[in-house]
């Protein structure tokens, strides 16, 4: 009975633990490192990259930016296995003519790139970047796209959750762990008490004092006393 009851006791607590460490806006987002990602699979017609970007900003995010090889690999793997995205994904990048460099829309630093070999002599005005899913490389292309088959968005874990949630998560984990331990101990104590009580009741019943005489003996004795034997 105790073993069968434990899963029912633990499942709600495990659900609370999962909720305590969830940092992304909803279950449709996927967390990796310090960011959350969502792939909007709806195909839309666009007039500029800003239309694509608006798809992300409407969800409180921005177009994808990539900052290391691990993140690039994560996006490729997730697009192939879970999101089922198109062959090329538009990156949240634009060419800044002021200093002749590519920059991310989310204003993060350009710390990593994976450009494929291309001729850089061409005019880069109105040039955007695409992630090629089959190779994982980035390639340059015209920003004047007429449609996109999906938009990949990214948002950072909120500051409050990222930097202040460690203590909250620790406290929540301790509370949950304590609750689990107390629940299990309570169930064990109850089980042992119930078992001991049943055993004690059985023992008391089986060892109750029994009369040395049965009813027949009592009757016989009574009869003997009622008619005493007379001696001459």
Swiss-Prot record:
Potential multifunctional C-type lectin receptor that may play roles in endocytosis and phagocytosis as well as in cell adhesion and migration. Isoform 2 and isoform 3 are produced in HRS cells by a transcriptional control mechanism which cotranscribe an mRNA containing LY75 and CD302 prior to generating the intergenically spliced mRNA to produce LY75/CD302 fusion proteins. It comes from Homo sapiens (Human). Residues 190-232 are cytoplasmic. This is CD302 antigen. The chain crosses the membrane at residues 169-189. GO terms for molecular function: carbohydrate binding; signaling receptor activity. PANTHER family: MANNOSE, PHOSPHOLIPASE, LECTIN RECEPTOR RELATED. One of its GO terms (cellular component) is filopodium.
């Amino acid at each position: 009975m105790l073993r069968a009851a434990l899963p029912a006791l633990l499942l709600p607590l495990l659900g609370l633990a999962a909720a305590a460490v969830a940092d992304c806006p909803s279950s449709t987002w996927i967390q990796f490192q310090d960011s959350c990602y969502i792939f909007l699979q709806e195909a839309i017609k666009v007039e500029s990259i800003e239309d694509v970007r608006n798809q992300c900003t409407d969800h409180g995010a921005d177009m994808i930016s990539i900052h290391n090889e691990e993140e690039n690999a994560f996006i490729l793997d997730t697009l192939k296995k879970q999101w089922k995205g198109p062959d090329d994904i538009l990156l949240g990048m634009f060419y800044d003519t002021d200093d002749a460099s590519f920059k991310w829309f989310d204003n993060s630093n350009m710390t990593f790139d994976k450009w494929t070999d291309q001729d850089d002599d061409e005019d880069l005005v109105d040039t955007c970047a695409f992630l090629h899913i089959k190779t994982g490389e980035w390639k340059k292309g015209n920003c004047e796209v007429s449609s996109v088959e999906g938009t990949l968005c990214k948002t950072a874990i909120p500051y409050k959750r990222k930097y202040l949630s460690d203590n909250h998560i620790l406290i929540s984990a301790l509370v949950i762990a304590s609750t689990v331990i107390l629940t299990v101990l309570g169930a064990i104590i109850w089980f042992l008490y119930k078992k001991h009580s049943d055993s004690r009741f059985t023992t008391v019943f089986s060892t109750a004092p029994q009369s040395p005489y049965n009813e027949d003996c009592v009757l016989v004795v009574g009869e003997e006393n009622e008619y005493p034997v007379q001696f001459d």
